[in-house]
Amino acid sequence: MALFRKRQNVPDEKEADRESGHRDNDETKARLKRGTRTRRITIGVVSFFYLLAIIFLILVEIGSIKRQPILRNIYIFKLDLSNILPQSAPSGLSLQNSVAKTLGLHDFYQVGLWSFCEGYNDQGITHCSKPDAAFWFNPVKIILDELLSGASIALPSEINDILNILRIAYHIMFGFFLGGLILDGVLLVISPIVLFSRWWSLPVGILSGISALVVVVGAILGTVIAYIFRAALNSQPDLGVQASIGTEMIAFQWAAAGFNLLAFLIHAGLGCCCTSRRDLRTGRKGGRAAQQTASPAS
C-alpha cells in the first residue's frame, strides 16, 4: 500500500518541477524585460527617427515628377522666364500673355531630382518630363530646343562652367539621397538587433554613420546647387530670368539629414549605455545592477 502511494506521488513531483520551471522562466523573462526597458525605448525612438527620415527622403526623391498637388510644390529651384529679354525675335510673332510664351518658351521650369516640370503662370504646370535616374537639368539645352526659329537669347558666357559643376554635383546628390534612403530602410529593419548585445551597436552604428554622412552631404549639395544657380541667374538683370529656391525641398532634405544624425548619435551611445540582454545574462556592467534591483521585485 505504501509502495502504491509512493508511485502515486511521482507524477505530482514532476508536475511541481514543471510548474517551478515555468515560474523561473517567467521570472527570467520579466527580469529581462525590466532590465532592458530603457534600451528598448531608445531603440524604438531610433526606429521612429529612421521612419521619419525615410518619409522625407521619399518626398525629396519624388518631388516634381508629376503634377499632383503635393509633388508639384517640391523642387530644388525654379526658373521664371516670363519676362525674359530676347536678343532677337522673328518677325510676325503674335504677342502672347508673356514674353516667354511669345518666344515659344514656357513661363517657368521647376527642377526635381528625377525630372523637371514646366508650365505657364495662367495655367500652372502643363508637363513633367519622364523620370530618369541619369537626369540633370540643363537650362541652355531646354531653352534652345523650345525657342522659336529666328529668336535668340544672350546667355552669360560663364553659364557653361556652372553647368559642368551642376551636372557632377547633381549626380552625386542623387546617388547620395538614393543610397541614404536604402540604408535607412535597412537600418529600420535591423536596429532592434542591438537590444540583444552592445556588440551589435558597433556594426549597426557604423552603418548608421555612413547613412547620416551620405544624407548630410546630399543635403549640402542640394542647398549649394540651389543657391549657386539662383545667384548666377539673378546676377544677370539683362537676361530677365529670375530663379527661386524650393524651400520645401530644402527643408525636407535637412529634416532627413537631422533625423539621420540623431539616430547615429543614439546608436553610438547604445554602444556604452543602456543595459542589453547579454549584460543581464552575464552580469556585466549595468546588467549586475539591473539583476540586483529586479530580484527583490520578483
Segments (PLM) and residue ranges:
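A surface-exposed beta-alpha-beta supersecondary segment
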Residues: 57-60, 71-169
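Intrinsically disordered, low-complexity terminal tails of fungal membrane proteins
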Residues: 1-40, 274-298
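Cytosolic juxtamembrane regulatory segments of membrane proteins
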Residues: 73-85, 207, 211, 279-289
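Short, well-structured alpha-helical interface segments that form or flank functional binding sites
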Residues: 112, 171, 198-201, 247
